[in-house]
Amino acid sequence: MDKKQLVRLAQDGSQAAFEELVTKYQSKVFSMAMSFIRNREAADDAAQEVFLKAYLALPKFHLRSEFGTWLYRIAINHIKDVLRKRGRAREVSLDDVRELSIVDENALEKADAERETEARKGLVLSCVQRLPEKYRVILTLRDIQGLPYDEISQVLHMSPGTVDSRLHRARRMLRTKLASHLGQEGGSHEM
């Protein structure tokens, strides 16, 4: 069954059809929330609230655009609200800390490599979070969520040219922030 059929069934009150739509989009919505909110529990709550808002607004959805595009628009607006309510306080989860059960040379090397990878990811996410919102949103949708330009254009209600130029600026700003941060640490890191 295609997405349009699922949407129509959900609009007609089919709980199973809506649950299937949730299943199809749950990981993408959660991932989007997580990339902005950076706290697993808060991102999970936000994702659930996005689906609740979508469910309540479903009768107003007219299938003129893709369901995913409509849902991402709801998600972006809700995530902005969550961040405004939190006062943009950044939360960093320490769930990445793992204990080694067997201490040997290979395990230590692997743990060091994982920590380095996590540190790099954390640095990139931290720099992304410091970008102005209009650039952070586009960078997240394209480079983290992997949405195509035309879908980003629809979600954000802007021309593909504007999406392209803002994405270019966002990437340049991110490179500058990363270079500045790495320069402060001695510049010996490779990204």
Write out the residue ranges for each language-model feature:
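DNA-recognition helix of helix-turn-helix
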Residues: 76, 80, 135, 144, ...
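Short, charged helix-capping/linker segments at alpha-helix termini
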Residues: 11-20, 30-49, 137, 160, ...
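Arg/Lys-rich amphipathic alpha helix in sigma70-family domain 2
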Residues: 59-63, 73-94, 117, 169
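Sigma70-family region 2
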Residues: 11-12, 38-39, 51-66, 85-86
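Structural recognition of an alpha-helix C-terminal capping motif at a helix-to-coil junction
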Residues: 45-52, 65-77
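Short, Lys/Arg-enriched C-terminal cap helix and immediately downstream tail that follows
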Residues: 84-87, 131, 136, 171-191
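Internal acidic/polar
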Residues: 3, 89-114, 148
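N-terminal module of bacterial RNA polymerase sigma factors
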Residues: 1-28, 35, 129, 151, ...
